[in-house]
Protein backbone atom coordinates (compact mmCIF):
# COMPACT_ATOMS: atom_id res chain seq x y z
CA UNK A 1 0.00 0.00 0.00
CA UNK A 2 1.47 3.34 -1.05
CA UNK A 3 1.32 6.29 1.34
CA UNK A 4 -1.17 9.03 0.34
CA UNK A 5 1.57 11.43 -0.68
CA UNK A 6 2.90 8.94 -3.22
CA UNK A 7 -0.37 7.48 -4.43
CA UNK A 8 -1.11 10.22 -6.96
CA UNK A 9 2.36 10.08 -8.50
CA UNK A 10 2.18 6.30 -8.61
CA UNK A 11 -1.10 6.13 -10.50
CA UNK A 12 -0.96 9.13 -12.82
CA UNK A 13 1.06 9.12 -16.02
CA UNK A 14 1.01 12.93 -16.35
CA UNK A 15 2.42 13.82 -12.91
CA UNK A 16 6.07 13.93 -11.90
CA UNK A 17 7.04 12.82 -8.41
CA UNK A 18 9.10 15.22 -6.24
CA UNK A 19 12.15 13.17 -7.28
CA UNK A 20 11.44 13.94 -10.95
CA UNK A 21 10.19 10.44 -11.75
CA UNK A 22 7.17 9.18 -13.65
CA UNK A 23 6.46 5.98 -11.79
CA UNK A 24 4.35 4.34 -14.49
CA UNK A 25 7.28 4.63 -16.91
CA UNK A 26 9.57 3.05 -14.33
CA UNK A 27 7.09 0.22 -13.78
CA UNK A 28 7.01 -0.33 -17.55
CA UNK A 29 10.79 -0.71 -17.34
CA UNK A 30 10.31 -3.45 -14.75
CA UNK A 31 8.15 -5.35 -17.25
CA UNK A 32 11.06 -5.19 -19.69
CA UNK A 33 13.46 -6.64 -17.11
CA UNK A 34 11.17 -9.66 -16.72
CA UNK A 35 10.91 -10.30 -20.47
CA UNK A 36 12.65 -12.98 -22.50
CA UNK A 37 16.21 -11.86 -23.32
CA UNK A 38 17.32 -10.49 -26.67
CA UNK A 39 20.88 -9.77 -27.83
CA UNK A 40 22.06 -7.43 -30.58
CA UNK A 41 25.61 -7.20 -31.96
CA UNK A 42 27.00 -4.94 -34.69
CA UNK A 43 30.34 -5.50 -36.43
CA UNK A 44 32.21 -4.37 -39.53
CA UNK A 45 30.40 -6.99 -41.64
CA UNK A 46 26.83 -6.35 -40.50
CA UNK A 47 24.47 -6.76 -37.56
CA UNK A 48 22.78 -9.70 -35.80
CA UNK A 49 19.85 -10.22 -33.43
CA UNK A 50 19.37 -13.36 -31.37
CA UNK A 51 16.58 -14.01 -28.89
CA UNK A 52 15.17 -16.67 -26.59
CA UNK A 53 11.61 -17.98 -26.60
CA UNK A 54 11.05 -19.75 -23.30
CA UNK A 55 9.04 -22.95 -23.22
CA UNK A 56 6.03 -21.91 -21.15
CA UNK A 57 4.37 -25.33 -21.32
CA UNK A 58 5.18 -28.89 -22.38
CA UNK A 59 2.49 -28.40 -25.05
CA UNK A 60 3.88 -25.06 -26.28
CA UNK A 61 4.41 -24.90 -30.05
CA UNK A 62 7.41 -22.58 -30.35
CA UNK A 63 6.82 -22.11 -34.09
CA UNK A 64 3.59 -20.22 -33.28
CA UNK A 65 5.47 -17.37 -31.61
CA UNK A 66 8.03 -15.01 -33.14
CA UNK A 67 10.65 -13.20 -31.10
CA UNK A 68 12.40 -11.49 -34.04
CA UNK A 69 10.13 -9.63 -36.46
CA UNK A 70 11.06 -8.50 -39.96
CA UNK A 71 9.99 -4.87 -40.41
CA UNK A 72 11.25 -4.41 -43.97
CA UNK A 73 13.68 -6.43 -46.05
CA UNK A 74 16.66 -4.63 -44.48
CA UNK A 75 15.57 -4.17 -40.86
CA UNK A 76 14.20 -6.28 -38.00
CA UNK A 77 13.16 -5.76 -34.39
CA UNK A 78 13.09 -7.94 -31.31
CA UNK A 79 11.13 -7.04 -28.15
CA UNK A 80 11.39 -7.78 -24.47
CA UNK A 81 8.54 -7.13 -22.08
CA UNK A 82 4.82 -7.33 -22.81
CA UNK A 83 4.54 -9.06 -26.18
CA UNK A 84 1.00 -7.73 -26.75
CA UNK A 85 2.41 -4.19 -26.54
CA UNK A 86 5.26 -5.23 -28.82
CA UNK A 87 2.82 -6.41 -31.49
CA UNK A 88 1.27 -2.93 -31.67
CA UNK A 89 4.67 -1.28 -32.09
CA UNK A 90 5.83 -3.85 -34.65
CA UNK A 91 2.70 -3.29 -36.75
CA UNK A 92 3.23 0.48 -36.49
CA UNK A 93 6.88 0.15 -37.54
CA UNK A 94 5.89 -1.94 -40.55
CA UNK A 95 3.33 0.68 -41.59
CA UNK A 96 5.94 3.45 -41.30
CA UNK A 97 8.49 1.47 -43.33
CA UNK A 98 5.94 0.55 -46.00
CA UNK A 99 4.69 4.13 -46.33
CA UNK A 100 8.25 5.44 -46.67
CA UNK A 101 9.04 2.91 -49.39
CA UNK A 102 5.80 3.73 -51.23
CA UNK A 103 6.30 7.52 -51.09
CA UNK A 104 10.06 7.75 -51.67
CA UNK A 105 10.72 4.48 -53.51
CA UNK A 106 13.62 3.65 -51.20
CA UNK A 107 14.13 1.70 -47.95
CA UNK A 108 13.73 3.67 -44.75
CA UNK A 109 16.82 4.57 -42.71
CA UNK A 110 16.99 2.46 -39.56
CA UNK A 111 17.38 5.49 -37.28
CA UNK A 112 14.42 7.28 -38.89
CA UNK A 113 12.27 4.19 -38.29
CA UNK A 114 13.49 3.91 -34.70
CA UNK A 115 12.71 7.57 -34.05
CA UNK A 116 9.17 7.15 -35.41
CA UNK A 117 8.53 4.21 -33.07
CA UNK A 118 9.98 6.12 -30.12
CA UNK A 119 7.87 9.19 -30.89
CA UNK A 120 4.80 6.98 -30.47
CA UNK A 121 6.20 5.53 -27.25
CA UNK A 122 6.90 8.98 -25.87
CA UNK A 123 3.35 10.17 -26.56
CA UNK A 124 2.08 7.50 -24.16
CA UNK A 125 4.09 9.09 -21.34
CA UNK A 126 2.36 12.48 -21.73
CA UNK A 127 -1.38 11.91 -21.90
CA UNK A 128 -3.88 10.66 -19.34
CA UNK A 129 -6.19 7.74 -19.99
CA UNK A 130 -3.41 5.46 -21.23
CA UNK A 131 -0.28 3.78 -19.94
CA UNK A 132 3.26 3.52 -21.33
CA UNK A 133 4.20 0.61 -23.58
CA UNK A 134 5.68 -2.05 -21.32
CA UNK A 135 8.23 -3.16 -23.87
CA UNK A 136 11.74 -2.38 -25.09
CA UNK A 137 12.88 -3.06 -28.64
CA UNK A 138 16.19 -3.80 -30.28
CA UNK A 139 15.97 -2.50 -33.84
CA UNK A 140 18.73 -3.63 -36.20
CA UNK A 141 19.41 -3.35 -39.90
CA UNK A 142 21.68 -2.17 -42.68
CA UNK A 143 20.99 1.03 -44.61
CA UNK A 144 22.95 3.61 -46.63
CA UNK A 145 24.87 4.53 -43.46
CA UNK A 146 25.98 0.95 -42.77
CA UNK A 147 25.04 -1.48 -40.01
CA UNK A 148 22.77 0.02 -37.35
CA UNK A 149 21.67 -1.19 -33.91
CA UNK A 150 19.36 0.76 -31.59
CA UNK A 151 17.87 0.03 -28.19
CA UNK A 152 14.59 1.70 -27.22
CA UNK A 153 12.97 1.90 -23.80
CA UNK A 154 9.38 2.55 -22.60
CA UNK A 155 10.01 6.28 -22.17
CA UNK A 156 10.72 6.75 -25.88
CA UNK A 157 14.50 7.10 -25.58
CA UNK A 158 16.63 5.35 -28.20
CA UNK A 159 20.39 4.83 -28.13
CA UNK A 160 22.76 3.32 -30.68
CA UNK A 161 24.98 0.43 -29.59
CA UNK A 162 27.76 -1.78 -30.89
CA UNK A 163 26.39 -4.60 -28.72
CA UNK A 164 23.60 -4.70 -26.14
CA UNK A 165 20.97 -6.86 -24.48
CA UNK A 166 17.48 -6.36 -23.05
CA UNK A 167 15.23 -8.51 -20.90
CA UNK A 168 15.92 -10.93 -18.07
CA UNK A 169 19.63 -11.49 -17.32
CA UNK A 170 20.57 -8.57 -19.58
CA UNK A 171 23.18 -7.48 -17.04
CA UNK A 172 24.99 -10.83 -17.24
CA UNK A 173 24.81 -10.83 -21.03
CA UNK A 174 26.13 -7.26 -21.22
CA UNK A 175 29.09 -8.18 -19.01
CA UNK A 176 29.93 -11.03 -21.39
CA UNK A 177 29.72 -8.71 -24.39
CA UNK A 178 31.92 -6.09 -22.74
CA UNK A 179 34.63 -8.71 -22.20
CA UNK A 180 34.45 -10.39 -25.61
CA UNK A 181 33.24 -7.80 -28.14
CA UNK A 182 35.39 -6.43 -30.93
CA UNK A 183 34.16 -4.47 -33.93
CA UNK A 184 36.57 -6.09 -36.39
CA UNK A 185 34.58 -9.33 -36.77
CA UNK A 186 33.29 -11.18 -39.79
CA UNK A 187 29.58 -12.02 -39.93
CA UNK A 188 30.05 -15.59 -38.77
CA UNK A 189 32.02 -14.48 -35.72
CA UNK A 190 29.39 -11.85 -34.93
CA UNK A 191 26.59 -14.43 -34.97
CA UNK A 192 28.62 -16.80 -32.80
CA UNK A 193 29.35 -14.04 -30.27
CA UNK A 194 25.64 -13.15 -30.03
CA UNK A 195 24.73 -16.80 -29.37
CA UNK A 196 27.51 -17.22 -26.82
CA UNK A 197 26.37 -14.05 -25.06
CA UNK A 198 22.81 -15.38 -24.86
CA UNK A 199 24.07 -18.74 -23.59
CA UNK A 200 26.15 -17.00 -20.90
CA UNK A 201 22.91 -16.25 -19.05
CA UNK A 202 20.40 -18.74 -20.47
CA UNK A 203 20.57 -22.54 -20.56
CA UNK A 204 19.63 -23.51 -24.11
CA UNK A 205 18.04 -26.98 -24.17
CA UNK A 206 16.06 -26.70 -27.42
CA UNK A 207 17.20 -24.95 -30.58
CA UNK A 208 13.55 -24.25 -31.43
CA UNK A 209 13.53 -21.74 -28.56
CA UNK A 210 16.26 -19.58 -30.12
CA UNK A 211 15.87 -17.22 -33.07
CA UNK A 212 18.65 -15.58 -35.08
CA UNK A 213 18.45 -12.92 -37.77
CA UNK A 214 21.27 -11.02 -39.46
CA UNK A 215 22.04 -8.58 -42.25
CA UNK A 216 25.35 -8.06 -44.02
CA UNK A 217 26.77 -4.78 -45.32
CA UNK A 218 27.06 -6.27 -48.82
CA UNK A 219 23.53 -7.62 -49.20
CA UNK A 220 21.61 -5.10 -47.05
CA UNK A 221 18.92 -7.73 -46.46
CA UNK A 222 17.78 -9.11 -43.12
CA UNK A 223 17.69 -12.90 -43.09
CA UNK A 224 16.24 -15.18 -40.40
CA UNK A 225 18.14 -18.41 -39.91
CA UNK A 226 16.17 -21.65 -40.15
CA UNK A 227 15.70 -23.87 -37.11
CA UNK A 228 18.08 -26.44 -38.61
CA UNK A 229 20.76 -23.78 -39.13
CA UNK A 230 20.37 -22.55 -35.55
CA UNK A 231 20.53 -26.12 -34.20
CA UNK A 232 23.66 -26.87 -36.22
CA UNK A 233 25.40 -23.72 -35.01
CA UNK A 234 24.45 -24.26 -31.36
CA UNK A 235 25.75 -27.83 -31.55
CA UNK A 236 28.98 -26.71 -33.22
CA UNK A 237 29.57 -24.15 -30.46
CA UNK A 238 28.67 -26.61 -27.70
CA UNK A 239 25.86 -24.37 -26.45
CA UNK A 240 23.00 -26.87 -26.72
CA UNK A 241 22.47 -28.52 -23.34
CA UNK A 242 20.58 -31.72 -22.61
CA UNK A 243 17.24 -31.11 -20.91
Curated annotation (Swiss-Prot):
Gene Ontology MF terms: threonine-type endopeptidase activity
Subcellular location, record wording: Cytoplasm
InterPro entries documented for this protein: Ntn_hydrolases_N, Proteasome_alpha, Proteasome_alpha-type, Proteasome_asu_arc, Proteasome_asu_N, Proteasome_sua/b
GO BP terms: proteasome-mediated ubiquitin-dependent protein catabolic process
Main location: cytoplasm
Domain of life: Archaea
GO cellular component: cytoplasm; proteasome core complex, alpha-subunit complex
Database matches in Gene3D superfamilies: Glutamine Phosphoribosylpyrophosphate, subunit 1, domain 1 (3.60.20.10)
Activity control summary: The formation of the proteasomal ATPase PAN-20S proteasome complex, via the docking of the C-termini of PAN into the intersubunit pockets in the alpha-rings, triggers opening of the gate for substrate entry. Interconversion between the open-gate and close-gate conformations leads to a dynamic regulation of the 20S proteasome proteolysis activity.
UniProt-listed PROSITE patterns: PROTEASOME_ALPHA_1 (PS00388), PROTEASOME_ALPHA_2 (PS51475)
Keywords: Cytoplasm, Proteasome
Entry keyword Nucleus: no
Complex and partners: The 20S proteasome core is composed of 14 alpha and 14 beta subunits that assemble into four stacked heptameric rings, resulting in a barrel-shaped structure. The two inner rings, each composed of seven catalytic beta subunits, are sandwiched by two outer rings, each composed of seven alpha subunits. The catalytic chamber with the active sites is on the inside of the barrel. Has a gated structure, the ends of the cylinder being occluded by the N-termini of the alpha-subunits. Is capped at one or both ends by the proteasome regulatory ATPase, PAN.
Physiological role: Component of the proteasome core, a large protease complex with broad specificity involved in protein degradation.
HAMAP family xrefs: Proteasome_A_A (MF_00289_A)
UniProt family annotation: Belongs to the peptidase T1A family.
Name the record gives this protein: Proteasome subunit alpha
Organism: Pyrobaculum aerophilum (strain ATCC 51768 / DSM 7523 / JCM 9630 / CIP 104966 / NBRC 100827 / IM2)
Amino acid sequence: MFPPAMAGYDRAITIFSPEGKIYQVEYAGEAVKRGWPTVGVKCKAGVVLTAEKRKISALFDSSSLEKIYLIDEHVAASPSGLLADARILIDYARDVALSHRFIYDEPIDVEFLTKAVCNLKQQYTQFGGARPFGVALLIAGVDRHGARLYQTDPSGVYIGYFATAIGAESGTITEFLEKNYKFDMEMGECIELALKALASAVEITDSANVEVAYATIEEKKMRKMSQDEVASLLTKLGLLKKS
